[in-house]
């Protein structure tokens, strides 16, 4: 999921984030990040569906 990041790298990143943002902000930051990723995936899915639909329409037009 995280490419070639190992456990020690993830712990280091989490530790740095904890120092920078503090323990009170991390849950809020995680929630915001999760929501942003979810919205991005949803938007990406919509774009793929639109492109697929446009391709089907173009193929039908060419075949007629």
Curated annotation (Swiss-Prot):
Coiled coil: none annotated. It comes from the Bacteria. It is a single-pass membrane protein. It is found in: Cell membrane. GO terms for molecular function: protein transmembrane transporter activity. One of its GO terms (biological process) is protein transport by the Tat complex. The chain crosses the membrane at residues 10-30. Keywords: Cell membrane, Membrane, Protein transport, Translocation, Transmembrane, Transmembrane helix, Transport. One of its GO terms (cellular component) is TAT protein transport complex. PANTHER family: SEC-INDEPENDENT PROTEIN TRANSLOCASE PROTEIN TATA (PTHR42982:SF1). Belongs to the TatA/E family. HAMAP family: TatA_E (MF_00236). Forms a complex with TatC. Part of the twin-arginine translocation (Tat) system that transports large folded proteins containing a characteristic twin-arginine motif in their signal peptide across membranes. TatA could form the protein-conducting channel of the Tat system. This is Sec-independent protein translocase protein TatA. The lineage of its organism: Bacteria, Bacillati, Bacillota, Clostridia, Peptostreptococcales.
């Amino acid at each position: 999921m995280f490419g070639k990041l190992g456990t020690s790298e993830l712990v280091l990143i989490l530790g740095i984030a904890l120092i920078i943002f503090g323990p009170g902000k991390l849950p809020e930051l995680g929630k915001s990040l999760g929501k942003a990723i979810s919205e991005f995936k949803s938007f990406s899915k919509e774009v793929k569906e639109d492109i697929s639909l446009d391709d089907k329409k173009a193929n039908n037009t060419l075949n007629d």
